[in-house]
Amino acid sequence: MVRQLVWQRATASRRLAPKCLSPQQLFARRGLATEASAARMPPYPKIVRNLEQVRKVLGSSRALTLAEKILYAHLDNAEESLLTGTNNGKDIRGKANLKLKPDRVAMQDASAQMALLQFMSCGLPSTAVPASIHCDHMIVGERGADTDLPASIEGNREVFDFLESAAKRYGIEFWPPGAGIIHQSVLENYAAPGLMMLGTDSHTPNAGGLGAIAIGVGGADAVDALVDAPWELKAPRILGVRLEGRLSGWASPKDIILHLAGKLTVRGGTGYVIEYHGPGVETLSCTGMATCCNMGAEVGATTSVFPFSPSMVPYLQATHRGHVAQAAAEIAASGPKNLLRADDGAEYDQLITIDLSTLEPHVNGPFTPDLSVRLSDFANTVRENKWPETLGAGLIGSCTNSSYEDMTRAEDLVKQASAAGLKPKADFFITPGSEQIRATLDRDQTLASFSEAGGTVLANACGPCIGQWKRTDGVAKGEDNAIFTSYNRNFPGRNDGNRRTMNFLASPEIVTALAYSGSTTFNPMTDTLKTPSGEEFKFRPPQGSDLPSAGFADGNPALQPSAGVPDASVEVIVSPTSERLALLEPFAPFPEGELSGLKVLYKVKGQCTTDTISAAGPWLKYKGHLPNISANTLIGAVNAATGETNVAYDDAGNKHSIPDLAARWKADGIEWLVVAEDNYGEGSAREHAALQPRYLGGRIIVAKSFARIHETNLKKQGVVPLTFADKADYDRIDACDQVDTVGLYETLQSGGQGSIQLQVTKKSGEKLTIPVNHTLSKDQCGFILAGSALNLLAKRAHQ
């Protein structure tokens, strides 16, 4: 049995210490969670009433998609949001500014720090909506859970203490280190059909597998919900994905989204909700649907959602939420226009049809999640591109693929190989998604199968997927190497800090099979392996179970969440000498006039993700300390002029790191901007990618296009995101050019009405005028004028 370290609740002295429990304690009944589940029912009567009001505003004959129903039923004022600037409600998608009231908020430990620091400055006694904190991002994967978890707890004690004390004070449920990955825990405990929630992580849409509208946001957006302020979203367009047929053989739900990512690309879903429908939906498990929704983030989608389906009822029942299942089933049976399915005749802005019966496994990568290749073509692709043919490691798990179904299908392959006397030729790592999953896999001997085969079972946490991987296989920085993972993201350097590690994304089944071959060119559907006795061995297609026949094991009671009851007597302390946490100083408001004398700090070439702008991995420890983490700003960005990474030049031609030059200019009172290409800020929801440039003196980012979450985060922190009216103008502006704005101040003052230009002065003295576009709403103009959304909230609170 894999023994899990358990979080010891903070004592009066506020000390946090790990301890091990006996097997008897490990499987104790989880009374707290079972009782708490009764309070996790979505406010269905209110949501249904709100939808009825929406029908009155838009007309009862208006056919709505599922996503529209759930979103519009959570509007603060349906008439205001749906009829303002929309041709009396005829042109809502892409035009209306929806002001929404989410049902709940979830935060992971890395992003929760800044979200809580912002929330604390508002001076409220508790959160306005139910909220939870999940400690999953700051746990390193190296040798296994028993070793890694205590070391990570000790190394992050100050941060975990801060998060737990803040949770206790403000009535937030606190899931301690080792309890599981945020999205798996949300699926098991909080997600429900028809729910709308925000999460401070880009893969929050995972909850769409249970019919929820769940949207990834930055911490400042989460604060809106926590203080009961309406949260604003540009009304998304709807991309319908019709599923037909049934998966078979080696194909899995992961292959649906890997295939879709190849069709849409990393920005093809921007501004859309992906809404799955069709007869194929009823053939998928709840956790399989969650996998599809999880990776909607990789195509830029606002979120993804599935309609209520037969698999949701047994999943809710198995996770102690039979009362939610019953209520949702009653709504689903209430008529053809019910909350939990699209209306007949609902129209989609785009429609893609996928035949599950003909879908085969896909492999996506390297370096981008949309480079999709069918498994049957992958070996040739490897050879044509001269990618490494030796597989260094196979890693399964993560929030995308750590369900009971995922793990038992992988176990089936392990058992087949073990019976033939085979062992993995590549390092093999397994990450359970939650304590409930881990305990169940332990009880059912699945973890024993992995361990006996030579696999390493990591803690119930993000680990290598978020860059918390301490590799011990001797791969040097800068050395080309290949890994296969069942993760969701594969940007350069993301997993191990080595930008030459090629991470190929696949299903857990394909990753497991390739780990046994040790080769990136192996195709388990057709190829064979040699057994120790010299015989040919071929894998059979994997089999698994959606849900455990004996029910889920309860797991360790010490890894259940604290009760969400506020306690004003709890003191939340942030030491002024801390290297990990720092209280926030308000940003200065926008000047009374145009911005002038800005300088171009950097012109970015190619892909610029949030990992590029604010790296994770070892930098996660500074997430609560803005001055310290700002030292990693844009360190992954490629210089458009020289091709160098993290190399910037000042006016005199002197060489600096990007954050060093930004800090020097800040000290000299020089404000700056960044010039970038398409989909700037793709990837995670981390608001540090907006906070850090703002802290260092950044005022504007001008790009060919933006990723949705990052564009919003910039506005929230007072940074102005602008796009080139003509993308060719990217080539006309260079590092160290001087820039003045024309029309920006007037646009901000008028609530977003007006046109903006950049007046560029080249080093030669030549002057250029570059027209730019914006997406600023009236409220967002208020954020920027005030200096940040938090400044505006504080100002309103004191009025």
Curated annotation (Swiss-Prot):
Q: What is its main location?
A: mitochondrion
Quote the transit peptide annotation as a residue range.
Answer: 1-32
What causes induction of this gene?
Answer: Constitutively expressed on glucose medium and on ethanol.
Q: Which residues bind substrate?
A: Q108, D201, S202, H203, R489, R494, A685, R686
The EC category is lyase
Q: Name one GO biological process term.
A: tricarboxylic acid cycle
**Pfam families to which the protein is assigned, alphabetical:** Aconitase, Aconitase_C
Q: What does this protein do?
A: Has no detectable activity towards cis-acontiate or cis-homoaconitate.
Q: Which Gene3D superfamilies match?
A: Aconitase, Domain 2, Aconitase, domain 3, Aconitase, domain 4
Binding-site positions, [4Fe-4S] cluster: C399, C462, C465
To which species is this protein native?
Answer: Aspergillus fumigatus (strain ATCC MYA-4609 / CBS 101355 / FGSC A1100 / Af293)
User: Under what name is this protein listed?
Assistant: Putative aconitate hydratase, mitochondrial
Domain of life, per lineage: Eukaryota
Single Gene Ontology MF annotation:
4 iron, 4 sulfur cluster binding
Give the span(s) annotated as Disordered.
538-564
Keywords (alphabetical) are: 4Fe-4S, Iron, Iron-sulfur, Lyase, Metal-binding, Mitochondrion, Transit peptide
A GO term from the CC aspect: cytosol
Compartmental location = Mitochondrion
What are the EC numbers? 4.2.1.-
Q: Which SUPFAM superfamilies match?
A: Aconitase iron-sulfur domain (SSF53732), LeuD/IlvD-like (SSF52016)
Question: Lineage, please?
Answer: Eukaryota, Fungi, Dikarya, Ascomycota, Pezizomycotina
Cystine links in this protein are none
Family from the record? Belongs to the aconitase/IPM isomerase family.
Any further remark recorded for this protein: The fermenting yeast S.cerevisiae has 2 aconitases, ACO1 essential for the citric acid cycle, and ACO2 specifically and exclusively contributing to lysine biosynthesis. In contrast, in respiring filamentous fungi the ACO2 homologs (acoB) seem enzymatically inactive and the ACO1 homolog (acoA) is solely responsible for these functions.
Q: Which InterPro entries match?
A: Acnase/IPM_dHydase_lsu_aba_1/3 (IPR015931), Acoase/IPM_deHydtase_lsu_aba (IPR001030), Aconitase/3IPM_dehydase_swvl (IPR015928), Aconitase/IPM_isomerase (IPR050926), Aconitase_4Fe-4S_BS (IPR018136), Aconitase_4Fe-4S_dom (IPR036008), Aconitase_dom2 (IPR015932), Aconitase_mito-like (IPR006248)
